[in-house]
């Protein structure tokens, strides 16, 4: 225990989580999302037959999937020739929908037959795509418990120890205090949290596909547009992988710091919000309010702890996307 003068405090330099610490975890999560979810979905959107003929008429465009009829409007590709043909059939262009409107009962029979056939194909594609996302979701639910991130946890731990040795003064003795069993327990929690985050994202994506995309496929959305949408969501998946990696790494390092500080007799810290009391436009109100205040690492000792959206007490850096810092306070005693 430190022996210094009474009634004085000394603030230590904060040890913050580095962006590089989550790099390997981000790459691993991204690979999992691509391999087990997005790439199979992209494969499911590929055409099984090829037709190299260039469509010219409205019916040919509908057959090719470049244009589809949703029951009121023609959607998809637009051209002067198509506009002229639809207008000749009595169609009216809607500026609000940015599409041509034409009641089906005013169409010639051959065009109605083409639309009916395309609807049948759309039903088949809807069923196929629905089965694919259900199958992938079940596969990931079975695979997720087998995922292991112990290596990433160990590397993050080593990086944290190195950073603490660099920033904490030699007069403050902070040594690794976790035995192998404790480290294994924290690594298990880390892995389980990452697994839950991955599954949460997959479940939300499946729900999104069911609510937003399957109805569009049912109306006639073609494979090309479907593939483009999946590619767009793949980009979202990459962003999510980065977010999950950042968040879980921040939580893991926060827990490690908390244990080591307490073992060293450092029971309190001062909350430092980005932008101080005024924030910077991204800082949470509660975090701006906490700026400059002292808190115990032991939440049970805090009368008014900072809480997340779920009502759980949190330290700086533990809430989603939180960039705040915990400034360790060394209490000087006789």
Q: Model-derived features: where do they sit?
A:
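Short loop/turn and capping residues at structural boundaries
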Residues: 96-97, 227, 242, 299
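Ordered, soluble secondary-structure elements with a strong preference for glycine-centered loop motifs
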Residues: 76-77, 200, 239
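Residue-level detector of short coil/turn "hinge" positions at structural boundaries
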Residues: 93-94, 223, 238, 268
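Accessory DNA-engaging acidic/polar modules
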Residues: 52-112
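N-terminal leader/targeting and assembly helices and adjacent pre-domain segments
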Residues: 1-58, 62-65, 109-236, 330-334
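Short glycine-rich, basic-tinged beta-strand/loop micro-motifs
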Residues: 62-73, 225, 263-278
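Acidic, glycine-rich two-metal-ion catalytic cores of nucleic acid-processing enzymes
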Residues: 235-236, 240-334
